[in-house]
Amino acid sequence: MQTLHALLRDIPAPDAEAMARAQQHIDGLLKPPGSLGRLETLAVQLAGMPGLNGTPQVDEKAVLVMCADHGVWDEGVAVSPKIVTAIQAANMTRGTTGVCVLAAQAGAKVHVIDVGIDAEPIPGVVNMRVARGCGNIAVGPAMSRLQAEALLLEVSRYTCDLAQRGVTLFGVGELGMANTTPAAAMVSVFTGSDAKEVVGIGANLPPSRIDNKVDVVRRAIAINQPNPRDGIDVLSKVGGFDLVGMTGVMLGAARCGLPVLLDGFLSYSAALAACQIAPAVRLYLIPSHFSAEKGARIALAHLSMDPYLHMAMRLGEGSGAALAMPIVEAACAMFHNMGELAASNIVLPEGNANAT
């Protein structure tokens, strides 16, 4: 059975030759070179992923939603009752939440995964529960390093198993009351930003309670002293089971050479951890939308990512990842279905990148 160290070691590098061939093919399509903008660069990125065999393609699609509760909820950093995590996880199994509707529209299957819900097991939810909620990061670590490593490996294996069964495009999502607080702590640590710069309203936290949330994040970092150069240390000390789970999806998909669509702010924090743990993961990450959460800009700048959609969304759940799946499919359709200039009577001046 593969260890976490072996999984990280075996993440493949991008196929530079395949990317060059893809760029050459795209430049020869029936359009001015570069005129489809980022759709072209996305197709080239996909072509470099070894799991897609040198060509942009999408077969089965899956959104993996990591569900967990957080001890830091006790600090008054969220307005929703903790039980909402379990209620919404159950609603996901019925297909009635935002991510389920958007995923169905995109033709993707939603996998609802319990990595730490503080409730009785829920029928229809995949059980990878580490504990009933993680520790309160304002007073100590979220979990042990061993727990974080074990969950990373378990989720990575689950992701790779889905890849073996035909999934070629993954989306990540989360569900957990108070989870924007550990996400803000992680972004603060990885980017070196003060908590005031990254803490937002989450699920409609009143402005009068923001200062408390900022203070909680600062205390969590001061008490736990996470090492920003050690992604697993940050996850285990100021993260949460859902954030570890999303990081595991990214590591597992990268190990299989396959793309992962990020969601919003929570997924950005997990992406920062994944890229710190294994920098090669970066090639496989596709930013879906620009989260409306306050710290989004800082996190995305640190990741050097520019999301494809600006929708003022902050639902989470993987909703943005599901919404962006058709964009990935459009890049593949462009690559495979457009005609070629060489077969037409059109001759474009060299360097012309403007649409006619």
Swiss-Prot record:
The keyword Glycosyltransferase applies. Catalyzes the synthesis of alpha-ribazole-5'-phosphate from nicotinate mononucleotide (NAMN) and 5,6-dimethylbenzimidazole (DMB). This is Nicotinate-nucleotide--dimethylbenzimidazole phosphoribosyltransferase. GO terms for biological process: cobalamin biosynthetic process. InterPro entries: Nict_dMeBzImd_PRibTrfase, Nict_dMeBzImd_PRibTrfase_bact, Nict_dMeBzImd_PRibTrfase_N, Nict_dMeBzImd_PRibTrfase_sf. Disulfide bonds: none annotated. PANTHER family: NICOTINATE-NUCLEOTIDE--DIMETHYLBENZIMIDAZOLE PHOSPHORIBOSYLTRANSFERASE. It catalyses: 5,6-dimethylbenzimidazole + nicotinate beta-D-ribonucleotide = alpha-ribazole 5'-phosphate + nicotinate + H(+). Homodimer. Keywords: Cobalamin biosynthesis, Glycosyltransferase, Transferase. CDD domains: DMB-PRT_CobT. SUPFAM superfamilies: Nicotinate mononucleotide:5,6-dimethylbenzimidazole phosphoribosyltransferase (CobT) (SSF52733). One of its GO terms (molecular function) is nicotinate-nucleotide-dimethylbenzimidazole phosphoribosyltransferase activity. Pathway: Nucleoside biosynthesis; alpha-ribazole biosynthesis; alpha-ribazole from 5,6-dimethylbenzimidazole: step 1/2. Its EC number is 2.4.2.21. It comes from Salmonella gallinarum (strain 287/91 / NCTC 13346). The active site is at E317. HAMAP family: CobT. Belongs to the CobT family.
